Amino acid sequence: MAAKGAREKIRLVSTAETGHFYTTTKNKRNMPEKMEIKKFDPVVRKHVIYKEAKIK
């Protein structure tokens, strides 16, 4: 059996408070800090910062 991987599913939530989010994975060993990335929010039709949140 293979060992469990270091990648974990995360949710990127818009800081524009629209409720829009993206899902992705990240490697916890290489990036232990919370991820912040600028992506397009189709609700406000602008690029905004998305912050990492746990998937429930």
UniProtKB/Swiss-Prot annotation:
Keywords: Ribonucleoprotein, Ribosomal protein
PROSITE patterns per record: RIBOSOMAL_L33
Chain segments annotated as coiled-coil in the UniProt record: none
Repeat among keywords: no
An MF annotation (GO) of this entry: structural constituent of ribosome
GO CC terms in record: cytosolic large ribosomal subunit
GO terms, biological process: translation
Origin: domain of life: Bacteria
HAMAP family noted in UniProt: Ribosomal_bL33 (MF_00294)
Similarity remark: Belongs to the bacterial ribosomal protein bL33 family.
The protein's name in its UniProt record: Large ribosomal subunit protein bL33
